[in-house]
Amino acid sequence: MYLIEILKSIFFGIVEGITEWLPISSTGHLILAEEFIQYQNQNEAFMSMFNVVIQLGAILAVMVIYFNKLNPFKPTKDKQEVRKTWRLWLKVLIATLPLLGVFKFDDWFDTHFHNMVSVALMLIIYGVAFIYLEKRNKARAIEPSVTELDKLPYTTAFYIGLFQVLALLPGTSRSGATIVGGLLNGTSRSVVTEFTFYLGIPVMFGASALKIFKFVKAGELLSFGQLFLLLVAMGVAFAVSMVAIRFLTSYVKKHDFTLFGKYRIVLGSVLLLYSFVRLFV
């Protein structure tokens, strides 16, 4: 029986690893997955913490892939490269500031929007936004004003960070929200995609620390079995993220986000239909 639980962890890790970086909402897909696949004898407190902390596996992949670029202490970097790295971290910090003011409301958002209908609506809304922005930019022949991450202005970093706040709504997608913000502000797909990867580092570590704190504060303790299931899911999320990040980085160099927009609309519509049918079954 415990083997089945491990297989579930592997499945959740695969879902997290793919959907955390593709702009299709990891939280939304995990909510959907839990509708049909659930751990046995695990309470709501554990699952709430699990759905957030599993993201640490995904963010570790970013730190591994971009370690050289993110590490200001690399011996082979000259002074100019070191300053460039610190400027990148400053931009990440600036973009994270808007979230600090709303983190305390995460429980409220979970209580009121952690459901399939809300997820479906957010999937559709941002799917439409992706398609609209891509069509608008093509119709107007709008060329991105920021094509290199080094030249991303601090004000633009903050502007993109404002869109991260919208990701508190399940189904939005943190990467999806920041990509929309970047496209609206004239940032190229490649730059906003890479910057989105980096933004996940403080956000996911902060969100995980907050969830663990609340979990412990509520008097909950992780059993060995729960810890093992969580670590398995994180490990799988890390491995799958290594592939997903490289895929998306390559994909956006030649394609736009229209395909992801269409996927979101189709999935959101299916979830709305499912929610409607479930009312009468």
UniProtKB/Swiss-Prot annotation:
GO terms under cellular component: plasma membrane
Enzyme class: hydrolase
Entry EC no(s): 3.6.1.27
Keyword Hydrolase in record: yes
Pfam families given in the database record: BacA (PF02673)
Membrane association type: Multi-pass membrane protein
Catalytic reaction equation(s): di-trans,octa-cis-undecaprenyl diphosphate + H2O = di-trans,octa-cis-undecaprenyl phosphate + phosphate + H(+)
Keywords for the protein's UniProt record, in alphabetical order: Antibiotic resistance, Cell membrane, Cell shape, Cell wall biogenesis/degradation, Hydrolase, Membrane, Peptidoglycan synthesis, Transmembrane, Transmembrane helix
Single Gene Ontology BP annotation: cell wall organization
Location(s) in or outside the cell: Cell membrane
InterPro entries documented for this protein: UppP
MF GO annotations: undecaprenyl-diphosphatase activity
Transmembrane annotation, as ranges: 4-24, 45-65, 89-109, 113-133, 152-172, 190-210, 225-245, 257-277
Keyword Glycosyltransferase: no
Primary site of residence: membrane
Family from the record: Belongs to the UppP family.
Chain's role: Catalyzes the dephosphorylation of undecaprenyl diphosphate (UPP). Confers resistance to bacitracin.
HAMAP family assigned: Undec_diphosphatase (MF_01006)
Additional free-text comment from the UniProt record: Bacitracin is thought to be involved in the inhibition of peptidoglycan synthesis by sequestering undecaprenyl diphosphate, thereby reducing the pool of lipid carrier available.
Name this protein carries in UniProt: Undecaprenyl-diphosphatase
Organism of origin: Streptococcus pneumoniae (strain ATCC BAA-255 / R6)
Name of the gene this protein is made from: uppP
